[in-house]
Amino acid sequence: TLVLTPLLTFMAMNKLGISANLMSLGGLAIAIGLMVDGSVVVVENAFLQLGRHAKSGESQLRVILRAVVEVATPVIFGVGIIILVFLPLMTLQGMEGKMFAPLAYTIAIALAISLVLSMTLTPVMTTYLLKPPAHDGDHDTKLISAMKRRYLKMLHWALGNERKTVILAVVAFVLTIGTLPFLGTAFIPEMKEGSVVPGINRVPNISLDESIKMEMEAMRLVMQVPGVKSAVSGVGRGESPADPQGPNESTPIVSLKPRSEWPPGWTQEDIQDAMREKLKVLPGVQVVMAQPISDRVDEMVTGVRSDIAVKVFGDDLDQLKKIAGQIGKVAQTLQGAQDLRIERISGQQYLSIEIDRQAIARLGLNVSDVNDLLETAVGGKVATEIFEGERRFPGVVRLPESFRNNVEAISNILITSRNGAQARLADVAKISVMDGPAQISRELGKRRIVVGVNVKDRDLGSFVAELQQKVDGQIKLPDGYYLEWGGQFQNMERALGHLKIIIPITIAAIFFLLFLLFNSLRFATLIITVLPFASIGGIIGLFISGEYLSVPASVGFIALWGIAVLNGVVLVSYIRGLREAGRSVRDAVVEGATLRFRPVMMTATVAMLGLIPFLFSSGPGSEVQRPLAIVVIGGLITCT
């Protein structure tokens, strides 16, 4: 099963058009520990039945067939429930949907294939490879026997102290739930891509030459930081619908050396902090740290390059700038705030020419005459066409650049009236240089300015909650002005909101399948009660590891519930059979728990072993898969 299932899964992925990417392969790696569950239960029961009928003279094939039929229903329903819990993940939207839908598809395909193999290939292989025991009895290893003895002592104590057991379980659950407010919430853990993008924003009115000079100095400073391998940068970006940039902006890509070559004890955050310190010497510069892939994804999905973006909407640019400055000051006071960036909308100088209508009237001119002259002198006007073979080029006439950039030269432009009288432009107009907006940003037709801030050493949810509270309490917005919250926070709100709908539906679907299996509300409710206590280990695991309650962690809880239900189905199905055979409740529970201890322990152990590598992995994408592994492993420890 473990060999054929991945191969058949790859074939199915190819037919369904699912690419082999970080998340789909991660889903297959997660499924490695789950795809043998059905086979473990089948082989375990076959071995047990062969021992019982060792001296009966019945053929081995018939005994194995009966053993498979005995566990077929609970195995099919159990693995089917695990597949079911992943199906709602396929409905996730946005960035989280792009990431976790391939994972869910891959796991569902792998488990479906493993289920078919466990019901067909595994029994056949068992007849050839499984040597029947010489007699019925205890065939456990020393380790399993020792574990079983300890478990039975605990089980007998629990059955003899039912009230204490229930109270302890409820208290443990309540105390664990009490830690939830301290976990913090986040969208998706930041992946370490091996490169850094220190986005640099200079004053808007800077010249291209000066911007290039400053960028070269910035790259020289960045290369002095330990752990930096190379730095490549470009200034500005062509006008495009995706992400235009002016000559005052740049997004250099800084490649980092392997971790073994970093200073001892340094992390990527330490390298980024060192870059910030180096770049502080550059005047008038805003620096926002990001990573190449996440930077582009954030820009495309949310329109901003920060963890949190506060969008201020209104009509007056000066008022927008004032409100944004107030929000920026509030954000700076919060613990964990870094890379504050307020969108620069001012800083561009304009030449203002106010025409004196009475003065031009005395010369017999109108406003359009003066405007035409200015358009020709400064902007240029097509005066003729130049032919070069079969090609034609417009010939534009305007003043030389040295005159166009000189206020005095423009003031001395002569205006000739219809009767031949001449006057300087300064005599018929008021000419002045004034500061104006460098850019005017709009969203859905409304003017806006963005305040962006990144969060360090703190969860996103609590930071935004505190910032919203302080902004609401300290800043009063004029009529017609309003705020919108975006960035990664927007993704987190959407994803967690979707999961709040998915999780209850998943639990309801599990309950429905359990009811179909047992045709009993009592047994279905009994197995469903495992879910809260399985969650205890997942929550404790997140709390101890310092991970936040994120989308991957939520996916981990969904996977955990499926595995916990499978183990519960295997155990309760056997106990139910013993009850129908006339055993008392206590005897049925003890015997069922004893005989099903090994398969339940094996399925849980194999699932945990398949996820342990994710705890210690440091490759790209491991940050996303680690919370999922922590939740499943921690939950299996408590629920098993």
Model-derived segments and spans:
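Hydrophobic transmembrane alpha-helices and their membrane-interface caps
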Residues: 1-48, 91, 109, 509-596, ...
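Transmembrane helices with small-residue packing motifs
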Residues: 18, 89-99, 170-206, 261-263, ...
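Extracytoplasmic/periplasmic membrane-proximal domains and adjacent transmembrane bundles
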Residues: 43, 57-58, 65, 288, ...
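Helix-loop junctions and hydrophobic alpha-helical segments within the transmembrane domains
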Residues: 43, 49-77, 148, 496, ...
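Interfacial helix-loop-helix hairpins and adjacent transmembrane helices
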Residues: 51-65, 95-101, 120-173, 204-210, ...
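Signature of alpha-helical transmembrane segments and their immediate interfacial
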Residues: 71, 139-189, 229, 281-286, ...
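Extracytoplasmic/periplasmic
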Residues: 185-258, 272-277, 313-350, 439
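Solvent-exposed, membrane-proximal periplasmic/extracellular interface segments of envelope transport
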Residues: 209-304, 358-380, 387
